[in-house]
Amino acid sequence: MLARFSRTAIKSGRYFSTSAKNTAPVSEAEEIEILKAVEAPQFKDAVKKTRQQYQDMISKLTNDESGKSITQSTGLRPTINISTPSGKIAHALFDAASSMRSVGIVAKELTQVKTIIDKTPGLKTALEGDIDNSEKTVMLELLQGSVTLSPVSGFFLYYMTYENNFKLINPALTDFKRLVGSLDTEMSIKLTVAHQYSEAEKKDLETNVKSFFPPETQFKFSYNVDPEIQKGYIIESPFINHDASYSTAVKKVKAQEQSVLAEFLNDIKNGIKNQTAVWETKEFRDKYLTLDESKN
């Protein structure tokens, strides 16, 4: 029944065609045939299998190897909603920072950006005024070059600049601050350190950590000692994750060195292959052999 229904439907174009000119009235007998086909066990079983295959496919795409969802957010959620255009941008920015456990870092960076905009004579007025967009772009490029930003903060300014959302930058920064300020005032933070900290060391570290949070936040610190990190510390919380350990820094430096070395050897090999003495060029010397004069 199901096979016959499918062949008939496709051949006639009555049930699945998007063309109105080929549509013919469906008779009562044909309606009964369709209903019988849909109610047939084979049809229901096919639908069930298709649904399960779809669910399995989605599960594979949205879960990691351990079966844990990679799309389910484990980050923070603001307790207020701002529906204005600038508020929607602020929510998107908050979600991005939350998913990367960097709300604290982004909040601190963008507070600095907002301070620069507010206190630089004429900058806020220029961004919200009628001057040419190219001039506004130059201003924001100079601003970005004057501060160190994490990927989330940097992308926010990049997006707002090149989408010409100049008038929404300051309002979005204000709304983002409101979202951050709406968070729960109690925060549990796990600190991993290389050795058992003294009270003085704990006070210094906790003061540094607190600078990433709203002033009214109540803190609950817990410590874990891991000698393998050698020096420094690791912060873990729903608000911010930050690895400032010596061992991680060494790994990053080694990875960068390996990357540069691999690129160096690749350039040499290509030069030999193409019979070009690339090592004698100014570009090669500037890239690999120039001394860092700042260390002299």
From Swiss-Prot:
Coiled coil: none annotated. Subunit OSCP, of the mitochondrial membrane ATP synthase complex (F(1)F(0) ATP synthase or Complex V) that produces ATP from ADP in the presence of a proton gradient across the membrane which is generated by electron transport complexes of the respiratory chain. ATP synthase complex consist of a soluble F(1) head domain - the catalytic core - and a membrane F(1) domain - the membrane proton channel. These two domains are linked by a central stalk rotating inside the F(1) region and a stationary peripheral stalk. Component of the ATP synthase complex composed at least of ATP5F1A/subunit alpha, ATP5F1B/subunit beta, ATP5MC1/subunit c (homooctomer), MT-ATP6/subunit a, MT-ATP8/subunit 8, ATP5ME/subunit e, ATP5MF/subunit f, ATP5MG/subunit g, ATP5MK/subunit k, ATP5MJ/subunit j, ATP5F1C/subunit gamma, ATP5F1D/subunit delta, ATP5F1E/subunit epsilon, ATP5PF/subunit F6, ATP5PB/subunit b, ATP5PD/subunit d, ATP5PO/subunit OSCP. The keyword Membrane applies. Belongs to the ATPase delta chain family. This is ATP synthase peripheral stalk subunit OSCP, mitochondrial. The gene is atp5po. Keywords: ATP synthesis, Hydrogen ion transport, Ion transport, Membrane, Mitochondrion, Mitochondrion inner membrane, Transit peptide, Transport. It comes from Dictyostelium discoideum (Social amoeba). GO terms for molecular function: proton-transporting ATP synthase activity, rotational mechanism. It is found in: Mitochondrion; Mitochondrion inner membrane. The keyword Membrane applies. It comes from the Eukaryota. GO terms for cellular component: mitochondrial inner membrane; phagocytic vesicle. GO terms for biological process: proton motive force-driven mitochondrial ATP synthesis.
